[in-house]
């Protein structure tokens, strides 16, 4: 083994042999030039990323008081964060529905497009509330999003019934948020909810109620062609308009 090392060392140039092994790590580049000694103060500390994150100054901008906050009650701020979570949950449920109906053994593609559109709308609702939170000087506190209660949505009628119940729950939460804003004397939040949410929720509930009624009249889910015809004609025309 020693003889092999001596043999190889004869073929290594003096410049390469003088190199020292280098360890890889996340560190800032050193300001160094040949013939100039290294300054220990220039060497970046090698710390794990988690330790670096935990050592941030807690008095930074995120933890400081807002300069724009006015007439914005902490209860309203917390309720908006809960509403954001509910809107994202609704988007999650609709996303599950959308990709269930695009499965090869279901193949109701207009149901899929309809629920995908609903999912994107719910995400937009959540983002709009996030923008409001920042505008009012609140702090966004995201929470875990609960998974949908089922993965197999059985039929178009069952999915529409679940969507109707979901929209009613979202609407009830918005009504409670509006009542809270009114109780705390926050006309801006009341106007925001009335302008962008409450009227749209009523329209969505009416639309889903109509879809459930028409599917039942057509004999879904027992009649084999009912959901196919509803998918092709009713939802197909709606998706073209959207």
Curated annotation (Swiss-Prot):
SUPFAM superfamilies: Ferritin-like (SSF47240). It is an enzyme of class 1 (oxidoreductase). One of its GO terms (molecular function) is ferric iron binding. GO terms for cellular component: cytoplasm; mitochondrial matrix; mitochondrion; nucleus. Residues 1-49 form a transit peptide. Fe cation 1 binds at residues 87, 122, 125. InterPro entries: Ferritin, Ferritin-like, Ferritin-like_diiron, Ferritin-like_SF, Ferritin_CS, Ferritin_DPS_dom. Detected in testis and erythroleukemia. Expression is very low or not detectable in brain, colon, heart, kidney, liver, lung, muscle, placental, spleen and small intestine. It is found in: Mitochondrion. It holds the Pfam family Ferritin. One of its GO terms (biological process) is iron ion transport. Residues 47-58 have a biased composition (Low complexity). It catalyses: 4 Fe(2+) + O2 + 4 H(+) = 4 Fe(3+) + 2 H2O. Its EC number is 1.16.3.1. Residues 47-71 are annotated as: Disordered. Keywords: Iron, Iron storage, Metal-binding, Mitochondrion, Oxidoreductase, Transit peptide. Residues 70-219 form the Ferritin-like diiron domain. Changing residue 204 to A: Increases ferroxidase activity and iron binding. Fe cation 2 binds at residues 122, 167, 201. Catalyzes the oxidation of ferrous iron(II) to ferric iron(III) and stores iron in a soluble, non-toxic, readily available form. Important for iron homeostasis. Iron is taken up in the ferrous form and deposited as ferric hydroxides after oxidation. Homooligomer of 24 subunits. The functional molecule is roughly spherical and contains a central cavity into which the polymeric mineral iron core is deposited. Belongs to the ferritin family. This is Ferritin, mitochondrial. It comes from Homo sapiens (Human).
């Amino acid at each position: 083994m020693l003889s092999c090392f001596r043999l190889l060392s004869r073929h290594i140039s003096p410049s390469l042999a003088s190199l020292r092994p280098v360890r890889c790590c996340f560190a800032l580049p050193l300001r160094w030039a040949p013939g100039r000694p290294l300054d220990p103060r220039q060497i970046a500390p090698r710390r794990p990323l988690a330790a670096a994150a935990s050592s941030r100054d807690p008095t930074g901008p995120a933890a400081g008081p807002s300069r724009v906050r006015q007439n914005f009650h902490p209860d309203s701020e917390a309720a908006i964060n809960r509403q954001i979570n509910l809107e994202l949950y609704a988007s999650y449920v609709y996303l599950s529905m959308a990709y269930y109906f695009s499965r090869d053994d279901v193949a109701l593609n207009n149901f899929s497009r309809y629920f995908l559109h609903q999912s994107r709308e719910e995400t937009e609702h959540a983002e709009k509330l996030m923008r409001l939170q920042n505008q009012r000087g609140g702090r966004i506190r995201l929470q875990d999003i609960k998974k949908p209660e089922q993965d197999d949505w059985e039929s178009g009628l069952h999915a529409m019934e679940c969507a109707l119940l979901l929209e009613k729950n979202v609407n009830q939460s918005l009504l409670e948020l509006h009542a809270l804003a009114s109780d705390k004397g926050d006309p801006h939040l009341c106007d925001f909810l009335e302008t962008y949410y409450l009227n749209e929720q009523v329209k969505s509930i009416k639309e889903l109620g109509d879809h459930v009624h028409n599917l039942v009249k057509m004999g879904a889910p027992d009649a084999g062609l009912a959901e196919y015809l509803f998918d092709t004609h009713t939802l197909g025309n709606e998706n073209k308009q959207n």
